[in-house]
Amino acid sequence: KLSKAEAEEQAMKYLERVQIPEQAHKYPGQLSGGQQQRVAIARSLCMNPKIMLFDEPTSALDPEMIKEVLDVMVGLAESGMTMLVVTHEMGFARTVADQMIFMDEGLIVEEAPPSEFFNNPKSDRTKLFLSQILQH
C-alpha cells in the first residue's frame, strides 16, 4: 500500500503523462470531457496495467477534445502499451493499430493488419463500411 505522499506523487506522474498536471486539484465537474477522459486514463495507469481496454473513448466529445484524448492514446501506443480499442475513429486506428478487427452484429467480419484492412478488405461488409466512411 502506498503512503499518501507516494500516492500523490504517482498521481501527479500520470497526470503529467496525460498532459494535465495543472488540473490535479479540480473536481470532475470543473473539467472538460476530454480532461475527464484523460483523468480516467491516468487513474488506470496508476494500476500499472499490462493492457488497457477502451470502449469508444472519444464518444460524446467535441473535435478538440477528441484530439486531446487520441494524442494521449498515441503516446501510450508509442510507449509500448497494449490497448484493445473499440472505436469509430478510423484515422486513429489506421495510425496506431497493429491489428484491425471489424465486427458487425456481434460477429468478426474481418481481421487484418491496418494496411491490408484499409487497402484490400476481403469481406463485402468491410468494403461497404470503408466506402461509406472514407468518402468524406
What are these regions (language model features)?
Residues 52-55:
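Catalytic Walker B motif of ABC-type/P-loop ATPase nucleotide-binding domains
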Residues 67-79:
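Helical segment within the ABC ATPase nucleotide-binding domain
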Residues 87-88:
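H-loop/switch region of ABC-family ATPase nucleotide-binding domains
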Residues 41:
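Hydrophobic anchor residue at the start of the ABC signature
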Residues 93-95:
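A short, surface-exposed alpha-helical micro-motif characterized by mixed small hydrophobic
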